[in-house]
Amino acid sequence: YFSIFSMTNKLFEKKTFTSFDKNYSAEIFIKKPDKYKDIENYSLAAENLITMGSGFSFAAASFKKDNLSISFEKFNRVINFDKENKSITVEGGMKFYDLLNFTLEHKLWIPQIPGYPLISIAGAVATNAHGKSCGFHGTIRNLIKKITIFHRDQGWLNLSENENKEIFDLTIGGFGLTGTIIDITFRLVDFEGFSFNTSIEKSHSAIDTVKKIQDNTNSENFVYSWNRTDQKNNFGNGFIFQNKINLETKSEKVKKIKKTKFIYNKKLFFLN
C-alpha cells in the first residue's frame, strides 16, 4: 500500500524490511529514484534519510522504522570505460555481477569482491569491502580513484586523493555518513586466468584457521574458511578453502556470472 510521507507531498511506498541476520524488522518508507534531480529533492525533503544499497548487511544498516530509505537499484549504469588506461566509472547501484560481467569481457576486474554477487558497488565502498585475497590485495580502497557524492548541505562533491581528500578517506568505509555515494571510478587490474584449482583443508580451531590463512596471504590465491561457532569445546573448527589461479589453462570464452538467489537457513552456525 502507499502512504504520504509526512515531510513531503509526494507518495512513498511503505514496506516492511528485515535485516539479513533476521534479528530486526521495521516498516519504512522507500523510494527508488531514476533521476539525479530526484536524489536532490528526496535528500532535501526528508528529515531522516538513509541510502540503501542491496540490503545485504547483517545488521539493519540501510533502514529504520518510519524513516525514508532511498534505493539506488536503478542507478546501475556504466558511465565511462577506458580499456587502454584500465579505468571504469559506474553508478553506485550497480551490482558486482554486472560489473564483473562487463570487465571480464576485457580481461580486467577488481579482485576485492565481497562474498555475494548482488552486493552493490556503493555498498562495498561504504563498507570498504574486501575479497578472498585481502591479505595480498587489501580492501576495495586500493583501487578507488574517484567518488561522487551528494550531501544535503554541501551539494555535489567530487572526491579523490587530490580533491576533498579528507572526505574521500572518510567516505570509504564510512557507511554513507558523509553523503550519498552516486558513482565511483576504479582502477582495474588484469585478470590472469579463467580457471582455478581448489583445495580444501580441515581446520581444528579458530586459532588454527588464522595461522593457516596467514601462511597464504602473500599470494594472489583466494583463501577463505567456514568455521562452526555452535560448539563450545570445538569452537572454530571447520574448513579452509584455497583457490589457485591455473595459468596453464587458457580460455578466450568468459562464462557469465549468474544472478543467483541466496536461501537463508537460520539453523546454520557458520562464519565465512
Regions found by a protein language model. Give the residues of each.
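Solvent-exposed alpha-helices and their adjacent loops that cap or buttress functional pockets
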Residues: 43, 61-62, 80-83, 119, ...
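Glycine-rich N-terminal segment of FAD-binding domains in flavoprotein oxidoreductases
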Residues: 21-115, 128-133
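Intrinsically disordered, low-complexity segments enriched in small residues
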Residues: 8-30, 260-272
